[in-house]
């Protein structure tokens, strides 16, 4: 059995969350496959040993896995296509579910995030910024939320660029509903990924969890507009923790949506003062 299927069957079991899955994954060797006999070499609790054995013996798990593979691609931590940058982050996703062009996982990428309720300042900045990224063959990643996320994805597609959407729910859900057409277009022309099983519904706590993937997947993160308590700042701070470049679009101090980017600049983020994007900067 390949290790991706092994991890997926573990993930499907009740009571096996991220920490337990990581405990098992850390003990696997560097090969691509695992056999039932290999389990004897693992130093696991009885609970985790039983879960590993069920992977090989539970026919219901086989059925569930086949259903998932009919719906999407599954990329595991041990697969060659798994992005190297994500391997380096704290709490890397061990399984990614994907629809679209998974070769984009190895492409140079910049994440753009910001307010769900931006002013036209964000729209103007993104519409000037993204064509330059596309010309440099850089993919644009974002979270498919309304507002800045949607503007970033749309600008990439409009300029015949590549875009990656990292969502905080399963791939079978369209959230927000207003982005149904955009999500469908990203599947056709870009890449849609999630660490959640395909039928997982959107829940508020999942979006901050998703942000670590947005931060880790890219070389850098750009914040256009965000309030000082915005979730976009979570992504920016995660990027800083992972030694990624953080860029912020400065704005007037009278605009509360510029409070987040301005604070990031004060904390050491690189201010975006033009749209040249020299190779040494991005």
Model-identified regions with their sequence ranges:
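Short, positively charged patches
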Residues: 1-124
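Glycine-biased, small-residue-rich flexible motifs in mid-sequence functional cores and linkers
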Residues: 77-282
